[in-house]
């Protein structure tokens, strides 16, 4: 059977149970009641000390074009079995709500809202799957990229992962997220076109194999490409590859820009040191050594500890697949809903797993920045009607272990959420990708080094205001009393 993509909208990119719930709301007449959902994750990925928020641009694209196509509706009616009246209702759905969100490149931490959805219940429900799909993946990859870039430091980090990504869209949106996280280029030409990311690349072993001779292959490559990085490990790196690269570079002289060589196998620490010596002695002290071959932050850390002479890092599989953590685990939880009297009432989910307890109510997230050293003291979650900037002395305390507390003075309370959609209308001006990357990099300066350690980082504080904490406790008690816990 041929898969048909014509008239394929992303609106059906949802779980069946979302549509089932919408049908139940619609039949009961509560589908237009205002609802508020928070998007957040509970635990930081990779054991990291922070996350980098990404995915907002695609969320905007998704919501801005939110509608069921006629083929969507035909499928839901004929193949899934929804009734015609409900199908007619679905035909009218557009996103008419409000979105407040962190902007891309923002530092994010566990149990704080990344994004808040306020919309009629049916609309807010049906968009859950796609929003989580987008934000979970892109935030995961941006965070992985940032971890790697922290280890790479001032050297160049290049994204090489397309062939190992989980399908085509994962490759390009993962590349975009990696750029937000600090990578300087991508090998994916489509991502370069779509997002303006600088593209970079060398050549494969197949070039050398096609000519059966490194000298001929390097010559043919140099004849067609002025900027040359030769892959030197097809046969023997030190006996053949590096000497041949040097020979061709000398013969071509000023006719090419001999950028350097790439190592893709073997002991990268040993080979890079030997190759560096050979290049220097041949009169190419500025030639760069590029390394690839299943690299990640841990391998790079070890190579640096062993004195590897590597200038540029091509990272693929373990970046684009977030190799050591398959998913972020972001969730989408109802925190407030309009009742039959038209009043907003807070909702809470209580679980046998304490980490799954939600924080009810419409909230704001602030970053508390010490004015004396421009470092963050922690993030501070308040109810919607609070403004910590009005406080001269702010008490910050652990939301579970409340005896852990501190007072902060002389601070700036920076609100992390901005209006993205208001009543279904996009009100946010998307920055370009370079600006987002610069913002992410600048944000990292707010953190002490202890929070940025690759291994066993210090836990960053995410605290509730007294009022927000009391509201949470009140809602817990209300639920316990209603169910006679």
Give a label for each model feature.
Residues 74-75, 143-147, 161, 452-459:
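Short coil/turn segments at secondary-structure boundaries
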Residues 35-91:
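N-terminal, Lys/Arg-enriched amphipathic/low-complexity engagement segments
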Residues 15, 55, 68-72, 76, ...:
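Alpha-helix initiation/capping motif
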Residues 200, 261, 289, 311-313:
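Hydrophobic residues within beta-strands of alpha/beta enzymes
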Residues 292:
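Short hydrophobic "strand-cap" motifs at the C-terminus of beta-strands
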Residues 55-58, 140, 432, 436:
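Short amphipathic alpha-helical segments
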Residues 2-33, 37, 46-48, 295-485:
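Gly/Ser/Thr/Ala-enriched C-terminal appendages of enzymes
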Residues 2-34, 43-45, 81, 87-96, ...:
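Buried, small/hydrophobic-residue-enriched core segments of structured protein domains
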């Amino acid at each position: 059977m041929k898969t048909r993509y014509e008239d394929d909208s992303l609106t059906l990119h949802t779980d069946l149970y979302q549509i089932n719930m919408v049908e139940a709301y619609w039949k009961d007449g509560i589908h237009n009641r205002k609802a508020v959902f928070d998007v957040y994750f509970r635990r930081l990925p990779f054991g990291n000390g922070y996350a980098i928020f990404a995915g907002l641009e695609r969320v905007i694209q998704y919501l801005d074009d939110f509608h069921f196509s006629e083929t969507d509706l035909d499928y839901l009616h004929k193949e899934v079995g929804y009734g015609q009246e409900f199908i007619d209702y679905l035909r009218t759905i557009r996103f008419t709500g409000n979105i407040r969100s962190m902007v891309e490149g923002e530092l994010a931490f566990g149990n704080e809202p990344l994004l808040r959805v306020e919309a009629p219940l049916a609309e807010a429900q049906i968009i859950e799957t796609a929003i989580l799909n987008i934000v979970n993946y892109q935030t995961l990859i941006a965070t992985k990229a940032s971890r790697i870039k922290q280890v790479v430091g001032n050297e160049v980090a290049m994204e090489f992962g397309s062939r190992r990504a989980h399908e085509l869209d994962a490759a390009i949106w993962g590349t975009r997220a990696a750029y937000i996280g600090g990578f300087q280029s991508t090998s994916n030409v489509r991502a370069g076109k779509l997002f303006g990311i600088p593209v970079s690349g060398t050549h494969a072993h197949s070039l050398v194999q096609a000519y059966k001779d490194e000298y001929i292959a390097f010559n043919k490559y140099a004849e067609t490409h002025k900027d040359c990085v030769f892959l030197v490990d097809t046969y023997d790196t030190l006996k053949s590859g590096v000497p041949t690269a040097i020979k061709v570079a000398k013969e071509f002289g000023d006719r090419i820009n001999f950028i350097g060589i790439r190592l893709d196998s073997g002991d990268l620490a040993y080979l890079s040191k030997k190759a560096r010596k050979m290049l220097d002695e041949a009169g190419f002290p500025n030639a760069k050594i590029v390394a690839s071959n299943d690299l990640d932050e841990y391998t790079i850390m070890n190579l640096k500890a062993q004195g590897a002479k590597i200038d540029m890092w091509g990272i693929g599989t373990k970046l684009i697949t977030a190799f050591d953590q398959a998913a972020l685990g972001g969730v989408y939880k109802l925190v407030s809903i309009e009742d039959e009297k038209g009043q907003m009432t807070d909702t809470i989910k209580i679980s046998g797993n304490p980490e799954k307890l939600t924080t009810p109510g419409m909230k704001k997230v602030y970053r508390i920045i010490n004015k004396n050293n421009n470092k963050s003291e922690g993030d501070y979650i308040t109810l919607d009607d609070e403004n910590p900037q009005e406080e001269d002395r702010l008490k910050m305390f652990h939301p579970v272990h409340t005896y852990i507390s501190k007072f902060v003075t002389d601070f700036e309370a920076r609100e992390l959420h901005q209006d993205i959609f208001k009543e279904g209308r996009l009100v946010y001006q998307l920055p370009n990708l370079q600006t987002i990357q610069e913002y992410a990099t600048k944000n990292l300066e707010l953190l002490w080094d202890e929070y940025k350690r690759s291994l066993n980082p210090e836990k960053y504080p995410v605290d509730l205001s007294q009022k927000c904490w009391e509201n949470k406790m009140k809602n817990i008690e209300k639920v316990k009393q209603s169910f006679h816990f």
